[in-house]
Amino acid sequence: MSMFLDTAKISVQAGRGGDGMVAFRREKYVPNGGPWGGDGGKGGSVIFRVDEGLRTLMDFRYNRKFKAKSGEKGMTKGMHGRGAEDLIVFVPQGTTVRDAETGKVITDLVEHGQEVVIAKGGRGGRGNIRFATPRNPAPEIAENGEPGEERQLELELKILADVGLVGFPSVGKSTLLSVVSSAKPKIGAYHFTTIVPNLGMVRTKSGDSFAMADLPGLIEGASQGVGLGTQFLRHIERTRVILHVIDMSASEGRDPYEDYVSINNELETYNLRLMERPQIIVANKMDIPEAQENLKAFKKKLAAQYDEFDDLPMIFPISSLAHQGLENLLEATAELLAKTDEFLLYDESDLVDEEAYYGFAETEKDFEITRDDDATWVLSGEKLERLFVMTNMERDESIMKFARQLRGMGVDEALRERGAKDGDPVRIGKFEFEFVD
């Protein structure tokens, strides 16, 4: 059996933009040729694409770092550097992508072929041909390429199924799935034979079809990690109907009604929303003599928990082994699915603010000023730091341009207001310079 992996932590880094070029046209009979340096190419983005052929996140077990290529540098004759190709990362249907730092959901990938840009490549730096003006017709200025976005991500796979089978171990969930679909789950006369989710397609005699998922068995205390815990319950979150399978023969010595209550308590503890899904009670192993009396007692206890005007959950007596009662169960399940809408998986508060996350929202401050213990003024801020890394500090004209940009942003004035004096050290990242008043 292939290994099943439904969670992974990875890092992605988009490619840096290529640096712009400083070059001048030098040709015979072309005096004062002027600037001729081209722009750098765009860095490659990291894109997630859904592949319906994938079933687990196993590909991410050993490959956890994904880095797109950088754009090429600008060239002479005003030619642009070649942009880097985007890095396509394939994920299975049902993959939720979260920001590892905040836990917020970035995207939920459920459609085959669906694509999402997870990390955007940096834009190419401008060459000196872009900075020519009447006052400075031969500028020795070019920008460095913009760094690509870098993110730490958590991937979580929740398989796509319409119907989920839940219940204690060895109540017959896997047998039921194997009988009503072409799935071949492992079946055995011991607990936790099923240790990974299994998926099968079910077709009723009336022509309806739906996907059914068999989950590893739960036991009391699963929400505290007993048994296999609730690690696989995430796979039931996309389902619209739950089939609660109960061993009505009580062959394990447990009371069927207590089983029913215990499993529902575990579902509620794991995720309160799971109890919003309609349940059908599947009274299995009815071919065993004791099951009939147990079913009567079960119905009596169940009815005692409801008011006389409440609708009781539907109960279908079946025997997966003897193929009894299956047709009625499947038809009722299909009818319930037809009138049950999909459930909202995430609240608005669970999602990232897309404008802020992808840098579209305007920040309140372009920069911040702090002071270190050694009396150095420290400048920080996303916009300011982006300007800094795109400045070629090896060319005087580029440094002067950066100084003008800082002045235009109000950095000089803000430093004066904070008490900065002429000659005070100022630091941006690892670059240090003196404040000139």
Curated annotation (Swiss-Prot):
Q: What does the record give as cofactor?
A: Mg(2+)
Q: What class of enzyme is it?
A: hydrolase
* Segments forming domain Obg: 2-160
The domain of life for this entry's organism is: Bacteria
Q: Where is the OBG-type G domain?
A: 161-338
InterPro entries per record: G_OBG (IPR031167), GTP-bd (IPR006073), GTP-bd_Obg/CgtA (IPR014100), GTP-bd_prot_GTP1/OBG_C_sf (IPR036346), GTP1-OBG_CS (IPR006074), GTP1_OBG_dom (IPR006169), GTP1_OBG_dom_sf (IPR036726), OBG_GTPase (IPR045086)
The OCT domain extends over 359-437
Coiled-coil stretches: none
Location comes to: Cytoplasm
Cross-referenced PROSITE patterns: G_OBG, GTP1_OBG, OBG, OCT
Binding residue positions for GTP? 167-174, 192-196, 214-217, 284-287, 319-321
Tell me which residues bind Mg(2+): 174, 194
A Gene Ontology MF term for this entry?
GTPase activity
One Gene Ontology cellular component: cytoplasm
* Pfam families, per the entry: DUF1967 (PF09269), GTP1_OBG (PF01018), MMR_HSR1 (PF01926)
EC id: 3.6.5.-
The biological processes this protein is annotated with in GO are: ribosome biogenesis
Q: Which UniProt keywords apply?
A: Cytoplasm, GTP-binding, Hydrolase, Magnesium, Metal-binding, Nucleotide-binding
Function of the molecule: An essential GTPase which binds GTP, GDP and possibly (p)ppGpp with moderate affinity, with high nucleotide exchange rates and a fairly low GTP hydrolysis rate. Plays a role in control of the cell cycle, stress response, ribosome biogenesis and in those bacteria that undergo differentiation, in morphogenesis control.
Family designation: Belongs to the TRAFAC class OBG-HflX-like GTPase superfamily. OBG GTPase family.
Q: Which PANTHER family match?
A: DEVELOPMENTALLY REGULATED GTP-BINDING PROTEIN-RELATED, MITOCHONDRIAL RIBOSOME-ASSOCIATED GTPASE 2
Q: How does it assemble?
A: Monomer.
What this protein is called in its record is GTPase Obg
Species for this entry: Streptococcus pyogenes serotype M1
